[in-house]
């Protein structure tokens, strides 16, 4: 194997030199060449790719005929909650529908991680298409919703928190992509306005921000959708949202593994950065929780729906935040036990195995495409008789 080729100027779509990807860091190594998946530095990313592919679905598989008539029966408060959440979810998945590929993909050094992020971005696009599908089937004029997403200041305020870390990294990474800074001899060059560690710090903050987005920011909206369905309202939409929730959990796990690999020393410099950014990361969690609580108050400003209000949602967001922080090795900071879900009835919507439906009635969430058990041995069926 040879080192990164010095004759490559800037980025390349295909590295023609032999680079051992199993010895590369996850990001900012040599450009990728052959997409080979027979060997992986981190098999967990290949496993996540297979898992996400097995969950593939399309919104058109779910009938929304009843949802159209259900929506007409909702009062103004319920319509405000349903529509506002749709608008915000569209914004989040518009960001995630292009963010991973646009920001992280160009600087990825492992084929198995590149593959996982490609599927991740594809599924986010399906989520965005799903919201359009819901809107087209529920509202007489879809433009009344879609044309006014960026007119809502509450949504724009949250959008800034979601996109700022992405944008800061994208702008800083431009010099890397347009130069030879990925080469060891060019890093930290005197002509560079920043060091490679500065750039990696922005990458960490972007990934940490996405981890929080995937793990917390959707869940107020999810809970509201499931609350309607518990009342036998907007059940088709809730079914689609449950597919999305299942996917987002996979994306959350992907970002958790990226951060954990950094913590374990995938890149020694990133390991230092993760430790240095601990307090800042905790502040990012706090800011997200505060914003989600404010969003819950905005949703329920004119009243509640049966089984759900802004107080319960605030407790739910704190509980989720504690879980997400614990998964990254941080101590929980909110007075919510990890064992006690404030909204236990949401769990069977988020866990696809908890939903029992007849195949002819709706899309079955627990059905996996291409799911194979590959640990069959010679004597596995020795006790079987025909």
Residue ranges of model-derived segments:
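Non-heme di-metal
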Residues: 2-386
């Amino acid at each position: 194997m040879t080192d990164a080729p010095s004759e490559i100027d800037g980025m390349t779509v295909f590295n023609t030199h032999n680079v051992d990807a199993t010895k590369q860091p996850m990001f900012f190594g040599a450009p990728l060449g052959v997409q080979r998946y027979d060997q992986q530095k981190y098999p967990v990313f290949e496993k996540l790719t297979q898992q996400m592919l097995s969950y593939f679905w399309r919104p058109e598989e779910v009938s929304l005929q009843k949802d159209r008539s259900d929506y007409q029966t909702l009062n103004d408060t319920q319509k405000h909650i349903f529509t506002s959440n749709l608008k915000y979810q569209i914004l989040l998945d518009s960001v995630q529908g292009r963010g991973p590929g646009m920001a992280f993909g160009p600087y990825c050094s492992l084929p198995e991680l590149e593959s996982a992020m490609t599927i991740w971005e594809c599924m986010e696009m399906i989520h965005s298409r799903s919201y359009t599908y819901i809107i087209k089937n529920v509202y007489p004029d879809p433009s009344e919703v879609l044309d006014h997403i960026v007119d809502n200041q509450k949504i724009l305020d949250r959008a800034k928190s979601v996109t700022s870390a992405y944008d800061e990294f994208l702008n800083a990474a431009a010099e890397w992509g347009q130069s030879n800074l990925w080469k060891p001899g060019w890093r930290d060059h005197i002509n560079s306005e920043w060091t490679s560690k500065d750039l990696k710090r922005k990458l960490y903050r972007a990934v940490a921000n996405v981890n929080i987005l995937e793990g917390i920011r959707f869940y107020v909206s999810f809970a509201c959708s499931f609350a309607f369905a518990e009342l036998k309202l907007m059940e088709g939409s809730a079914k689609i949202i449950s597919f999305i929730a299942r996917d987002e959990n996979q994306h959350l796990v992907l970002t958790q593994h990226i951060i954990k690999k950094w913590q374990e020393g995938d890149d020694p410099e990133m390991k230092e950065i993760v430790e240095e950014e601990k307090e800042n990361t905790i502040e990012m969690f706090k800011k997200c929780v505060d914003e989600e609580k404010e969003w819950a108050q905005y949703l329920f400003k004119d009243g509640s729906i049966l089984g759900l209000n802004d107080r319960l949602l605030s407790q739910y967001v704190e509980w989720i935040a504690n879980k997400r922080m614990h998964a990254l090795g941080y101590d929980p900071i909110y007075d919510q036990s990890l064992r006690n879900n404030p909204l236990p009835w949401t769990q069977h919507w988020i866990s696809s195995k908890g939903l029992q439906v007849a195949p002819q009635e709706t899309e079955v969430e627990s059905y996996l495409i291409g799911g194979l058990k590959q640990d069959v041995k010679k004597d596995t069926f020795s006790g079987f008789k025909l």
